[in-house]
């Protein structure tokens, strides 16, 4: 049996992080979402076909040494069903299909017992997903995409993991495009439901559909709490390390720094002196957290520098960023309500604590502050003494026009 993983989409709800990488390459607990998926299935399949499109080189380069993986280009993103169809000539028998942006803990063993099956997850907000109604013997009797609250009959939703027979390709080929003009995999599933040929298997463990920045941080927190301590880097004098912490070889923790796990500090990173890394933090390769800086519950991407007197909380900071002295990310509203984030032009409630979401190659001057939930596009410059209270598009230069008044002093 082979597997197909859908990785071609742009992930626009995760801008600015996905301005520079495909969504499946966003790191969760130090490794890409798609790597977590592959680890779950690779012992069950002979080949893994990654359906790639947007920024495909990032995926291909990362997995170039894995002999099980092959790549199929979806030149135009014409729907999930169309993406699966691109693999038709490569798949000879039954196969798995997985969305490239779902992360989960359960084994896939149970779904393999059926000819056609969908993994299900029990969630608190089913209106945001495809809601599944189960009948006798785990047969699916209804699938309703993003229903109104009054239409919801179940909290079980389509978890984006499928076991399908080869005959599904024939169903997909005969589907009419949806209202969006796309070939939808869910329309093929509805055909199977009509014929009583689709089963549902409920996942009992953790599952998350990574659709928003706070989903990234939530999944990161969950999987960090599964790590086992391993300290291979250089730990200098008077360093305090508590909890489960991974410090890779080549990382350096300088004197008087405090590391509280769970946390991961990757190779080439330098922390301190007198730095504070708090729980649920990941420092990717070659990052620098300097004197009297504090990082809490955040993901700091490769080659980013947060040199001194800065605070980063509940934030995602892209690669190759450089923060000026006393750069601060606020992460909590005065009224304790969920932080509002602008997603594709609409205000969306996120979570109680959320800092800044900053793209790659952003530089800040001294004393820059970011209000909760703001997003800063890639390759932007933020001048000194700015308070950023709104989203900034990529390639922007932001500065403050304060007038400096100089007069003769009084005698």
From Swiss-Prot:
Residues 1-204 are annotated as: Pyrophosphorylase. Disulfide bonds: none annotated. GO terms for biological process: UDP-N-acetylglucosamine biosynthetic process. In the N-terminal section; belongs to the N-acetylglucosamine-1-phosphate uridyltransferase family. In the C-terminal section; belongs to the transferase hexapeptide repeat family. The active site is at residue 308. N-acetyl-alpha-D-glucosamine 1-phosphate binds at residues 80, 130, 142, 158. The keyword Methyltransferase does not apply. It catalyses: N-acetyl-alpha-D-glucosamine 1-phosphate + UTP + H(+) = UDP-N-acetyl-alpha-D-glucosamine + diphosphate; alpha-D-glucosamine 1-phosphate + acetyl-CoA = N-acetyl-alpha-D-glucosamine 1-phosphate + CoA + H(+). InterPro entries: Bifunctiontional_GlmU_arc-type, GlmU-like, Hexapep, NTP_transferase_dom, Nucleotide-diphossugar_trans, Trimer_LpxA-like_sf. Catalyzes the last two sequential reactions in the de novo biosynthetic pathway for UDP-N-acetyl-glucosamine (UDP-GlcNAc). Responsible for the acetylation of GlcN-1-P to GlcNAc-1-P, and for the uridyl transfer from UTP to GlcNAc-1-P, to produce UDP-GlcNAc and pyrophosphate. Its EC number is 2.7.7.23, 2.3.1.157. Residues 205-224 are annotated as: Linker. Pathway: Nucleotide-sugar biosynthesis; UDP-N-acetyl-alpha-D-glucosamine biosynthesis; N-acetyl-alpha-D-glucosamine 1-phosphate from alpha-D-glucosamine 6-phosphate (route II): step 2/2; Nucleotide-sugar biosynthesis; UDP-N-acetyl-alpha-D-glucosamine biosynthesis; UDP-N-acetyl-alpha-D-glucosamine from N-acetyl-alpha-D-glucosamine 1-phosphate: step 1/1. This is Bifunctional protein GlmU. Keywords: Acyltransferase, Multifunctional enzyme, Nucleotidyltransferase, Repeat, Transferase. Acetyl-CoA binds at residues 384, 401. The lineage of its organism: Archaea, Methanobacteriati, Methanobacteriota, Methanomada group, Methanococci. PANTHER family: N-ACETYLMURAMATE ALPHA-1-PHOSPHATE URIDYLYLTRANSFERASE, NUCLEOTIDYL TRANSFERASE.
């Amino acid at each position: 049996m082979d597997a197909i993983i859908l990785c071609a989409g742009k992930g626009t709800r995760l801008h600015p992080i996905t301005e520079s990488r495909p969504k499946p390459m966003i790191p969760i607990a130090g490794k890409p979402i798609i790597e977590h998926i592959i680890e779950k299935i690779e012992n069950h399949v002979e080949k893994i076909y990654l359906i790639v499109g947007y920024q495909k080189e990032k995926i291909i380069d990362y997995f170039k040494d894995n002999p099980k993986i092959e790549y199929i280009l979806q030149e135009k993103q014409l729907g999930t069903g169309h993406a699966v169809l691109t693999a038709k000539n490569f798949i000879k028998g039954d196969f798995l299909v997985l969305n490239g942006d779902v992360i989960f803990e359960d084994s896939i063993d149970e779904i393999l017992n059926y000819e056609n099956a969908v993994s299900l997850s029990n969630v608190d907000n089913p209106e945001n997903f495809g809601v599944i109604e189960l009948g006798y013997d785990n047969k699916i009797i209804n699938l309703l995409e993003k229903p109104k609250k009054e239409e919801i009959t179940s909290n079980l939703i389509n978890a984006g993991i499928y076991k399908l027979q080869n005959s599904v390709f024939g169903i997909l080929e005969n589907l009419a495009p949806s209202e969006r003009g796309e070939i939808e995999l869910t329309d093929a599933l509805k055909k199977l439901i009509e014929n009583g040929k689709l089963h549902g298997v409920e996942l009992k463990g953790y599952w998350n559909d990574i659709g928003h920045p706070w989903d990234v941080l939530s999944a990161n927190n969950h999987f960090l709490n599964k790590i086992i301590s391993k300290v291979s880097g250089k730990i200098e004098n008077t360093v305090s390390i508590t909890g489960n912490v991974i410090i890779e070889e080549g990382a350096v923790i300088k004197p008087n720094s405090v590391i509280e796990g769970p946390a991961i500090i990757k190779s080439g990173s330098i922390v301190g002196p007198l730095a504070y890394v708090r729980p649920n933090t990941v420092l990717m390769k070659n990052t620098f957290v300097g004197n009297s800086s504090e990082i809490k519950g955040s993901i700091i991407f490769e080659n980013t520098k947060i040199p001194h007197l800065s605070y980063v909380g509940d934030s995602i900071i892209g690669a190759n960023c450089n923060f000026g002295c006393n750069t601060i990310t606020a992460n909590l509203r005065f009224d304790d309500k969920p932080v509002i984030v602008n997603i594709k032009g609409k205000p969306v409630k996120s979570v109680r604590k959320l800092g800044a979401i900053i793209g790659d190659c952003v530089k800040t001057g001294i004393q820059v502050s970011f209000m909760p939930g703001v997003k800063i596009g890639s390759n932007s410059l933020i001048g000194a003494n700015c308070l950023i209270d709104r989203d900034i598009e990529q390639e922007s230069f932001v500065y403050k026009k304060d007038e400096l008044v100089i007069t003769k002093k009084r005698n």
